[in-house]
């Protein structure tokens, strides 16, 4: 549909320039207009990205991050293409989309829909997460990771489990300031959309992509879709925002500006599930024990903001105990809303038993016992039978 004030381009010989199909994700400019960026091109800025006029954005109440499909017309005098008609916004007609509630108008509730990650007997990582740190739709999860504790492998295993068990979820991975070879590895192993601003990109790229990807996920959740976002890492994202805001005159310890973490914390806080339908699950990594006071302060600022925390341990990794999860420090808030009663009772008994051990011994025992069973269901049945005999 074309607003009446947007007349089509006319070629030099007076003939109208033909319309072509086009689509992309809307990135807004502070002056009110926008451009359609290509997800297949990592949302990079290209001269061929269609221009969306401000009056069209206002008319259809378009928000940053929406997927727009319509008709595009090539501009004259070396101008880029312009959107002339809008056919669909997030799979809806423009009129339907204009009536949808915004992200902040929807009602957030506690996660209640358990996302099972167990696939087969191996890997044990996802089976242990199901027992000790269960994830639900709308979870705000933080993976706390010292260097070389298996963070990358854990993220890959989680992404593969989500793709296998929950194909209805829209899986997105955001990589900020990561090594280029790791970006390539993730793109080859993750069966979802991988958006990356690698360490050879500038700070502005890190900040721009972080905000655009979150807005994209919010728009999908508004439209009733269930989105699963893996973010690696929230620490490097916060570092980028610290450089981006500059020096406002007030600096915390470690060289972090007082306002630098406002936006990253707001982005992480967008994870939620809506009563009306739709959800955004965020699993983000936080780096610790890097020798940087800034990283430690960033972790302390984010600690407690999630409703699930999984802590990786260097001592376990050094002994090659995988997954290197510190059981005593890891858990999910309100897990009783996710787990069925039998599983919850078994998990409580398991935690009581393991809590009396050193955390290294506890994980060694758990992995050894769990590997004997083909599924968590069999393992839980054994715990339940031993409880009945007692």
Predicted regions mapped to residue ranges:
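Beta-strand/loop nucleic-acid-binding surfaces
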Residues: 45-60
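Hydrophobic beta-strand signal
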Residues: 67-69, 142
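Short, acidic/hydrophobic/Gly-rich beta-strand patch recurrent on exposed beta strands
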Residues: 34-39, 51, 85, 187
């Amino acid at each position: 549909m074309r607003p009446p004030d947007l007349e089509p381009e006319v070629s030099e010989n007076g003939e109208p320039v033909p319309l072509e199909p086009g689509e992309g994700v809307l990135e807004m400019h502070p002056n009110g207009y926008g451009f359609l960026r290509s997800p297949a091109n990592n949302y990079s800025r290209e001269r061929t990205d269609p221009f969306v006029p401000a009056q069209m954005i206002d008319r259809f109440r378009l928000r940053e991050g929406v997927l727009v499909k319509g008709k595009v017309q090539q501009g004259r005098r070396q101008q880029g293409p312009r959107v002339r008609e809008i056919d669909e916004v997030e799979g809806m007609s423009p009129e339907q989309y204009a009536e949808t509630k915004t992200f902040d108008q929807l009602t957030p509730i506690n996660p209640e829909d358990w996302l099972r990650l167990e696939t087969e007997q191996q890997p044990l990582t996802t089976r242990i997460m199901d027992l000790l740190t269960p994830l639900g739709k709308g979870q705000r999860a933080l993976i706390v990771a010292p260097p070389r504790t298996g963070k990358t492998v854990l993220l890959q295993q989680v992404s593969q489990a989500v793709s296998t068990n929950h194909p209805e979820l829209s899986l997105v991975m955001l990589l900020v300031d990561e090594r280029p070879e790791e970006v390539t590895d993730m793109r080859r192993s993750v069966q979802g959309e991988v958006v990356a601003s690698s360490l050879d990109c500038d700070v502005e790229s890190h900040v721009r992509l972080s905000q655009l990807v979150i807005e994209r996920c919010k728009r999908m959740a508004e439209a009733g879709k269930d989105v699963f976002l893996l973010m690696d890492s929230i620490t490097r994202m916060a570092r980028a925002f610290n450089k981006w805001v500059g020096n406002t005159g007030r600096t915390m310890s470690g060289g972090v500006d007082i306002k630098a973490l406002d936006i990253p914390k707001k982005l992480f806080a967008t994870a939620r599930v809506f009563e009306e339908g739709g959800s955004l699950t965020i699993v983000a990594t936080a780096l610790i024990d890097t020798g940087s006071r800034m990283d430690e302060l960033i972790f302390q600022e984010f600690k407690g903001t999630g409703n699930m925390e999984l802590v990786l341990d260097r001592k376990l990794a050094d002994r090659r105990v995988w997954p290197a999860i510190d059981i005593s420090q890891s858990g999910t808030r309100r897990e009783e809303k996710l787990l069925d009663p039998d599983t919850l009772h078994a998990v409580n008994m398991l935690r009581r038993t393991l809590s009396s051990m050193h955390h290294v011994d506890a994980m060694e025992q758990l992995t050894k016992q769990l590997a004997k069973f083909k599924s968590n269901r069999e393992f839980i049945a054994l715990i339940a039978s031993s409880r009945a005999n007692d």
